[in-house]
From Swiss-Prot:
Subcellular location as annotated: Nucleus, Nucleolus; Nucleus, Nucleoplasm; Mitochondrion
Protein name: Flap endonuclease 1
Compositionally biased intervals (Basic residues): 363-377
Family: Belongs to the XPG/RAD2 endonuclease family. FEN1 subfamily.
Binding-site positions, DNA: R47, R70, E158, G231, D233
Protein encoded by which gene: FEN1
Cellular component GO terms, alphabetical: mitochondrion; nucleolus; nucleoplasm; nucleus
Cofactor (UniProt): Mg(2+)
Enzyme Commission designation: 3.1.-.-
Length: 377
């Protein structure tokens, strides 16, 4: 779920912290991608008849096709992706997971009714709600990434938290996910829609945490409390207090603790045994692997092993897979020059940066940043 309504709220209270960008402008960037979120997107991208892509054995292969081609597209645009997989969910998430199970059961009942009625629109709608990423999906995707030469990280807990840790340590430039709680975990740059299909024509939404906090007039601790008030995966929120009221309360009282001392709890009762302090601590100090102990290596794809896995085992067309591998190999060799601005330690002013870009020819055209924000790591 992430944080309820946060993207829209930030568009209202901190628009300078958000910009739209094109994938080509991330040339030379290392980006940590929330693997489960991406795999989920690939799985719900069902075909026009409402079914997922399967092989002759009836095994779902949508996730493998999506991962293969979207990863190639990123590498063709000079991006160095690293996928981060979820580990064991925190105990605080058990309530949210139970709610998701209930919603799936309701969706299953609704799907059965839609199938009886021949209601194709609702069949599609409720089929999507039943999709979930399994351990098998994850393991197959890890195998594919390894054969493609793309690094991945297994987080001990939440993938978004591990992505944020990689960004904060300077190992990567940004977190790629649809879940807004990557910002709550402290990622300095977050990209939405990065792994969407080109057919959707959705620009990449780029969030810069420091600009968001500055324009919203909040510290990171206050922002975390705001996210808990809006609704997160780890505890309930106060009923009857919407996004605008939540912002006003945080700006006035600066913490949930002070809000509880000052609001009329008879009108807005907090949840019983409210675990907001535990949720706050989880956002501030999540369980992650030490980024300094993580080595990220992008290597040559193993063509024959890829063909064996994707074609002989999973039933994909050999011509198409070999064509994809050629694109991947060519793109890898074309993106080794890196970003021009990665050679500079001092951050130039926006005006100086434009002068540098105007004077460096085609190499710099590839390396342009398209924005006024901080240089990459």
């Amino acid at each position: 779920m992430g944080i309820q309504g946060l993207a829209k709220l930030l568009g209202d209270i901190a628009p300078s912290g958000i910009k739209e960008n094109e994938i080509k402008n991330y040339f030379g960037r290392k980006i940590a991608i929330d693997a489960s979120m991406s795999i989920y997107q690939f799985l719900i991208a069902v075909r026009s008849d409402g079914s997922q892509l399967t092989n002759e054995a009836g095994e779902t292969t949508s996730h493998l096709m999506g991962l293969f081609y979207r990863t190639i597209r990123m590498v063709e645009n000079g991006i160095k992706p690293v996928y981060v997989f979820d580990g064991k969910p925190p105990q605080l998430k058990s309530g949210e997971l139970a709610k998701r199970t209930e919603r799936r059961e309701e969706a299953q009942k609704a799907l059965s009714k839609a199938e009886e009625a021949g209601d194709t629109e609702n069949i599609d709608k409720f089929s999507r709600r039943l999709v979930r990423v399994t351990k098998e999906h994850n393991e197959e995707c890890k195998q594919l990434l390894k054969l493609m030469g793309i690094p991945y990280v297994e987080a001990p807990c939440e993938a978004e938290a591990q992505c944020a840790a990689l960004v904060k340590s300077g190992k990567v430039y940004a977190t790629g996910t649809e879940d807004m709680d990557a910002l709550t975990f402290g990622t300095t740059v977050m990209l939405r829609h990065l792994t969407f299909s080109e057919a959707k024509k959705m620009p990449i939404k780029e969030f810069h945490l420091q600009n968001v906090l500055s324009e919203a007039g909040l510290s990171q601790d206050e922002f975390i409390d705001l996210c808990i008030l809006l609704g997160c995966d780890y505890c309930d929120s106060i009923k009857g207090i919407g996004p605008k009221r939540s912002v006003d309360l945080i700006r006035q009282h600066r913490s949930i603790d002070k809000i509880l001392e000052n609001i009329d709890t008879s009108k807005h009762p907090p949840p019983e045994n409210w675990l907001y302090k535990e949720a706050r601590e989880l956002f501030k100090n999540p369980e992650v692997r030490n980024p300094e102990e993580i080595e990220l290596k992008w290597e040559e794809p193993n063509e024959e092993a890829l063909v064996t896995f994707m074609c002989q085992e999973k039933g994909f067309s050999e011509d198409r897979i070999r064509s994809g591998i050629k694109k991947l190999t060519k793109a890898r060799h074309g993106s080794t020059q890196g970003r021009l601005d990665s050679f500079f330690k001092v951050l130039p002013s926006p005006a100086n940066k434009r002068k540098l870009q105007d004077g460096k020819g085609s190499q710099n055209k590839k390396a342009k940043t398209g924005g006024k924000f901080k240089r990459p790591k």
